[in-house]
Amino acid sequence: MSHLFDPRLPALAASPMLYLYGPERPGLPLAFAPAAALAASGRAETPQKPPYSYIALIAMAIQDAPEQRVTLNGIYQFIMDRFPFYHDNRQGWQNSIRHNLSLNDCFVKVPREKGRPGKGSYWTLDPRCLDMFENGNYRRRKRKPKPGPGAPEAKRPRAETHQRSAEAQPEAGSGAGGSGPAISRLQAAPAGPSPLLDGPSPPAPLHWPGTASPNEDAGDAAQGAAAVAVGQAARTGDGPGSPLRPASRSSPKSSDKSKSFSIDSILAGKQGQKPPSGDELLGGAKPGPGGRLGASLLAASSSLRPPFNASLMLDPHVQGGFYQLGIPFLSYFPLQVPDTVLHFQ
């Protein structure tokens, strides 16, 4: 413990020093060293940079002036007198002082009056910026830029023109003779195969030619004639400019009639009927007066019984297409048509 209180211990060569800066007094060192030690340490160490921005330094110089205005050289002299750090490298920080004076709105340049001695204009503080300095420091505020008078008006015409162009597009589509919506419907329709030309007719149970009674044949023929007449009247009433309608709408009764047969009725009819004659085997349809369109497509000899009968009806309104192809096709007899119907262009 004796070496801690030994008087021969060397004294501290340089004690830590703290400088307090202010606008009214120079740096005041706080230390408990002799004056000689303070002088030696001050020469050896460079002075500390004051914790103030250039804007705060300029504001201090302006407020310290008697008329609250000072020239550029007066600002330089005030800074060098109060803060020893700025004695060196004058060119660097003086450029920064000029830069802040010209770009900051808080500093206002006042021209010198005529006849007043000296040269250079004065710099003063804007009265609206006095509250931006707290304890000598400049408090930056983020000012929201005020929109110009023409900014909102410039945006409104753009929105209005965009809305008008959007409204003009449906009007242009509807004004073209009504063809726009029709074209859009045709384009939006699925490109599926036609039920008349491409797709086969709905399947129906097989019906042997010999099982049909004369009463059933007469009723089926009447229903088929009415269906064909209604279909032709609907197609001719539309006119040449109307779109083609599917002809399958005119034969719902015949399809329902053909679907009404079941396997039990076929088996019961086969047990109660006798084998048909040769005339029924060849045609499957009774010959009528004047000759009729719709001869049997499949012929068989007298010794063989055809498994089914097929009839073909041509549609005069659809070129190259068939009205209906059914296997079997015994729901109605083929109708007698004039020769002009079979004349295709």
Curated annotation (Swiss-Prot):
It holds the Pfam family Forkhead. GO terms for cellular component: chromatin; nucleus. Keywords: Deafness, Disease variant, DNA-binding, Nucleus, Transcription, Transcription regulation. Residues 48-139 bind DNA. SMART domains: FH. It comes from the Eukaryota. It is found in: Nucleus. Residues 188-199, 220-234, 242-253 have a biased composition (Low complexity). One of its GO terms (biological process) is regulation of Wnt signaling pathway. SUPFAM superfamilies: Winged helix' DNA-binding domain. It is linked to Otosclerosis 11: A form of otosclerosis, a pathological condition of the ear characterized by formation of spongy bone in the labyrinth capsule, especially in front of and posterior to the footplate of the stapes, resulting in conductive hearing impairment. Cochlear otosclerosis may also develop, resulting in sensorineural hearing loss. OTSC11 is an autosomal dominant form characterized by onset of progressive deafness in the second to third decade of life. Deafness ranges from moderate to severe, and may be conductive, sensorineural, or mixed. Transcription factor required for proper proliferation and differentiation in the gastrointestinal epithelium. Target gene of the hedgehog (Hh) signaling pathway via GLI2 and GLI3 transcription factors. This is Forkhead box protein L1. It comes from Homo sapiens.
